[in-house]
From Swiss-Prot:
Belongs to the neurotoxin 12 (Hwtx-2) family. 02 (Hwtx-2) subfamily. One of its GO terms (molecular function) is toxin activity. One of its GO terms (cellular component) is host cell postsynaptic membrane. Disulfide bonds join C52-C66, C56-C77, C71-C82. This is U4-theraphotoxin-Hhn1q. Expressed by the venom gland. It comes from Cyriopagopus hainanus. Pfam families: Toxin_20 (PF08089). Postsynaptic neurotoxin. The keyword Ribosomal protein does not apply. InterPro entries: Hwtx-2-like. Keywords: Disulfide bond, Neurotoxin, Postsynaptic neurotoxin, Secreted, Signal, Toxin.
């Protein structure tokens, strides 16, 4: 009787662990598909950095101050670079 009970509990524990692992694997694969690839994120960051560095290089013309372009995405232009605020 005890052996049967232990066998049933062991099988149940293995089944629960297997199901949990399968769900985690499925969730990870869905996250990888939905997200933006790293290369696209890097291109967006490089574009923002370029825009900011170009706009920060604008100098005064006569008595008028040139307005710098603002960085997008919650970033500010500091030291000729877009930095997160």
């Amino acid at each position: 009787m005890k052996v049967t009970l232990i066998a049933i509990l062991t099988c149940a524990a293995v089944l629960v662990l297997h199901t949990t692992a399968a769900e985690e694997l499925e969730a990870e694969s869905q996250l990888m598909e939905v997200g933006m690839p790293d290369t696209e994120l890097a291109a967006v960051d490089e574009e923002r950095l370029f825009e900011c560095s170009v706009s920060c290089e604008i100098e005064k013309e006569g008595n008028k101050d040139c307005k710098k372009k603002k960085c997008r995405g919650g970033r500010k232009c500091k030291f000729n670079m877009c930095v997160k605020v």
